[in-house]
Amino acid sequence: MGVAAVLDWLVQDGERLASCRHDHPFAVLGPQASDQGWTVRMWMPEAQSVSLLQAGEEIAMTTPNHPWVFEAQVSQDPGCHYRVKVERGGIVHEQHDPWAFRGEWMGEMDRHLFAEGNHHHIWQKMGAHLTERDGITGVMFCLWAPNALSVSVIGDLNSWDGRHHPMQQRVGGIWELFVPGLEEGHLYKYEIRTQDGHCYQKADPYGFQHEVRPDNSSVVARLNGFQWSDQTWMQKRDSSNALDQPISVYEMHLGSWIHASADEPWIQPDGTPRPPVPAADMKPGARLLTYAELADRLIPYVKDRGFTHIEVMPITEHPFDGSWGYQVTGWYAPTSRYGTPDEFRAFVDRCHAEGIGVIIDWVPGHFPKDAHGLAFFDGAHLYEHSDPRIGEHKEWGTLIFNYSRNEVRNFLVANLIFWFEQFHIDGIRVDAVASMLYRDYLRPDGEWLPNESGGRENTEAVRFLQQANHVLFQHFPGALSIAEESTTWPMVTQPTDSGGLGFNLKWNMGWMHDMLDYFELDPWFRQFHQNNITFSIWYTYTENFMLALSHDEVVHGKSHLMHKMPGDDWQKYANTRALLSYMWTHPGKKTIFMGMEFGQRAEWNVWGDLQWDLLNYEPHKGIQRLVDDLNVLYKAEPALWRDDFDQFGFQWIDCNDNRHSVISFMRRESASGTWLVVVANFTPQSHSHYRVGVPLSGFYEEIFNSDAAKYGGSNLGNMGGKPTDEWGIHGYENSLDLCLPPLSLMVFKHDPKRSLNSSEPDNIV
């Protein structure tokens, strides 16, 4: 190439750089070998002068080809340690040359694994990484944007001007740039120039921290600086069967559990106040609690209640409070509403120290259309399908991931591993699984596309869920993976090698709807709907079910649990206690939403907080005591959880007394052979001398009674227990003559050490 051609080429490169249209800046910038030695070129928009500093010498750089392309001649390869002195706008500073660091960040194997969808730690390459290259500290930026014409890093480092830091395109649509000297806390985005000339500013899909809403820039954050203290917990978890334990989950939304006053900011460890994050518009002057404050207040509360796990509604970064977190824009970052990533790590660490597991809601089914997010990311439908018939949830106003694309699946599967590895979470609840499994979900005829076989099943999503669960349990065998799946899709909790989806728990939506339909009935009509409370047993062993009374049942005009109940206030309290008691004694793991544990009356509202003042009233305090005691009973009696998924664990005594709306059954444990007798009366009418058959003669201690005075009940019961009579009923030769309190549930335990002739105890219940 002649001199004139080279000069013309450099002029064109300068124009491409100036117009943010250059995809290979390393071809012209940084150290470049030539016949005369080495040329060092720097791209410095709007700089007045630039000098090369090397080996104690300052060499003035010239602009022979473009006013912003500065260059100097040196005799030897300058490497990457040289610095430049830049004068811009009357300010002089020194820096290293970003385009001197030419080595690839993502290696060939990284690119290969990512392209086939199997790079389970891709976040260690993608995103913004505080690192050191050739002894120089800075931040390595790495982005996947295969359809982009050019990509630049913008942010605090360059006054958000995309002309300053163009990135280098690598194989496979990967863009890279190392910015020396950049530190933790810097704000940044990517400026993406599309093939048709449009320019978008996007947050980092792999960003590890983002600004507090309404701002939405990504933040350079350190990944591995937190000192964990939960090694014993983690070792025990991953060496245990996740389901062979009592699981009682407190589902909650961090931002609406309780608020604090903005006049009382949280004082950070360095002694400075944290700027308050307003708690929206329902309570002027209210602010959100920080992760640290939640650790101080929430964890002791949950521990006192006896729950084994906290499930937090989505804490991944999201722009709109009203989405409850289910419209995610920052998949690799806990929301900054409540603090920093390390503060969330400290929250999890504290939970583990107190014996409480942490489950997060994970939303791989869809994402919002926010301009800074994944939608139309690089000028093309990169993360979503291009056809709205399979790529858009019109009712939700969101987009659907293209699960057929390897890199998109990799983004999600690695994200799952990221949360377990980086934040030590113990489980996930996957939201809206049914919306992923069916192509016609919430779609009228003509607005969806069938699969390759002509069916409605989304086979791509099925394969994705199977891959995600398979990889999860490979890495974390003690994890919980819970599906919110509202249809009868088969084998949700069966292993993937058997054709199942690979979850180990599924929310029992049928049980939830049947229970709420039943308990909303006037008790007189319940005799005609006995099937509602018995039907679940006929299918409960088809999956590993978790019983859930979730946030979805206390919003959008459905009212809270207390207000669903019929009758006067006393009956509402009693019905609530009876429902919760039946839930805790029914096969399946447990989840209730915050507020249910004390009888919240108002619907949940994300803009407010819970009605904590209700605990000043004894009936609500009684419901809280009931939940406390149910959790104590549940954890103390393996018959209530050990064989949740084995038919041996449950046996009806009588489910046919429709007229009285009474049911009785046994919960059994195979390992010890112990069992419990459960009797429930779902009408306000008490019953004396009610006979219940039992398998062995002897004394049966009444170990729980939801009608006890301390719970707000009428204090009817069986004097602490009853001996059996030789009166055959329900297929047994022996039976108990019981008093059944109104709207109640009781649990009895056979006491082999107690004689039938023992004197009766003095207590009433």
Swiss-Prot record:
Cite the EC number: 2.4.1.18
Q: Which GO terms describe its biological process?
A: glycogen biosynthetic process
Matching Gene3D superfamilies: Glycosidases, Golgi alpha-mannosidase II, Immunoglobulins
List the GO molecular function terms.
1,4-alpha-glucan branching enzyme activity; cation binding; hydrolase activity, hydrolyzing O-glycosyl compounds
One GO cellular component from the entry?
cytosol
Catalytic residues identified in the record: 431 (nucleophile), 484 (proton donor)
- What is a single Pfam family found in this protein's UniProt entry? Alpha-amylase
UniProt-listed SUPFAM superfamilies: (Trans)glycosidases (SSF51445), E set domains (SSF81296), Glycosyl hydrolase domain (SSF51011)
Task: Spell out the reaction equation it catalyses.
Answer: Transfers a segment of a (1->4)-alpha-D-glucan chain to a primary hydroxy group in a similar glucan chain
Alphabetically ordered keywords of this record: Carbohydrate metabolism, Glycogen biosynthesis, Glycogen metabolism, Glycosyltransferase, Transferase
Q: Does the keyword Glycosyltransferase apply?
A: yes
Q: Which family does it belong to?
A: Belongs to the glycosyl hydrolase 13 family. GlgB subfamily.
HAMAP family recorded for this chain? Answer: GlgB
Q: What does this protein do?
A: Catalyzes the formation of the alpha-1,6-glucosidic linkages in glycogen by scission of a 1,4-alpha-linked oligosaccharide from growing alpha-1,4-glucan chains and the subsequent attachment of the oligosaccharide to the alpha-1,6 position.
Its name, as the record gives it, is: 1,4-alpha-glucan branching enzyme GlgB
Q: Which organism is it from?
A: Synechococcus sp. (strain CC9605)
Q: Which gene encodes it?
A: glgB
